[in-house]
Amino acid sequence: MATATFDLTGGVPEDREFVVAEKPDDGLRDAVNVWIEEENGLFAMRIGVEAVGNAWDRHEFWLDVAFADGRVLSKRGDGETHSPYGEDGRATVRGTGPVRFECIEPFRRWLVSYKGQAAETSTQQLIEDPDFAETRWTDLDIAVEMDMAAPPWVPGSLLPEAAEALGGEQGSFMSPRYEQLFRCSGTLCVDGEVRRFKANGLRIRRTGFRAFAGFWGHCWQSAVFPDGRAFGLNIYPPREDGGPNYAEGWIIDRDGLRVPARPVQVPWLRRFVTGGEDVSLVLETIDGRRVAIAGTTFVNVRSCGGFAKPVDWPEDFPLVQQSHAFYTWDGQRTTGMIERSSKPSVMEV
């Protein structure tokens, strides 16, 4: 549990929290995005802004709000870039069009808001047609205050073999980044109807160059529990050439300390369903403990389109699904995230 004296930096320099303020080299990406899961599994959302050097005046953004009954409100696009500077003159704001992120206190408190329209769709429609025609629109107003609940995790920092894997081509799929679990409260207003909520979430800060050529899939899961325990993992599937694949995880136990772990059982993506999917996992810590965490999704969202694929895009490039799940660890339940991707050739599609 985070307190006023609890170190939430994880050793990451404070200036990593500040956004890139001036136009960088073409291709460099500076992104802030969050996953948010309502504490009772009634709905969940993903919101993000991606600032790209060669389109600096109009940052990209994405939004999905998914309800447990299968309703989805979705928007992809770009917008007029907000000033990166907060009231104190520091580069604490990443915003564009209807989306705004603001760092209030590094590694402790962030705000996110969305005010605009979103297209009506459903989890089933996205399975059948991820590039669906946007014909029905809904007014949407979101405001969330996020309080960080654990120190950030920098992928590649916990296991030597993970650092080695990310030091090569596999690191280009992810780009330099860290992620931090949080708890939050906020309001969700859909067509004038206001709903107040409490939730759990994961915040990602990513700055650097990113490439996807050669990417072959992944499984990424994380959550924080009411008693302060938490876990996270990210793993790429075993390689066809038998070479080492990136695989890294961790737990935070009741003592508040992060213990590195290796994923030994994960729920690879094999088919698209709308929810109710078993996404249980097993981690093996470096001190020899086997940690089993049960998981069941309460809503699954196949990743939307929103960008023009290059003409040389591989036919077997991985398909992506973002989902939100109930996780249970030694009898205690919470809500958290899971994102997976797999090549169509290994899926039931």
Give short role names for the model-derived ranges.
Residues 1-349:
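Structured soluble/peripheral alpha/beta segments that form catalytic or ligand/cofactor-binding pockets
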